Structure formats: C-alpha cells, structure tokens
A protein has these predicted regions:
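Intrinsically disordered, low-complexity terminal regions
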Residues: 1-69
Length: 69
C-alpha cells in the first residue's frame, strides 16, 4: 500500500469546514486526504506522460486538463 502525503490535514479540515461541516472526525479527514492525495498523484502522473509524449519537459495546463478529463 502506497501512502501519499501531499495534502495537509489543515487543508482537508478547511475544505470540510468551507463545505459546511461543523466538526469532523480524524478518520473522516484522513480518508478524504488519502483519496485526494491518490487522485492528485494519478493526475500528475498522467500529465507528465502527456508532456513527455508531446516532447516537452514542462507540464502545462493543457496536460493537466487532459489528464483530468
């Protein structure tokens, strides 16, 4: 099992608060954090592959948008 540590607990806490959650459990925050970390990493990997395929060293917005779609 790969553990990603890109998105901070404070970021997830703020996201949930802004979405209307008054209180959140640590388990709930950790689960959302794991999901968001994994999805962000997968998108980043796809974007890098797309930029390499286009023979570019720089990942640009079109790579990210295509990786998300």
């Amino acid at each position: 099992m790969v553990i990603f540590l890109y998105i901070s607990d404070n970021t997830v806490r703020k996201l949930l608060k802004d979405a209307g959650a008054g209180r959140t459990s640590k388990e709930a925050r950790n689960e959302l954090k794991r999901y968001l970390d994994k999805k962000a990493f997968e998108i980043a990997q796809k974007a890098v592959k797309l930029s390499h395929h286009a023979k570019r060293k720089t990942v640009d917005i079109s790579d990210i948008k295509l990786a998300i779609s």
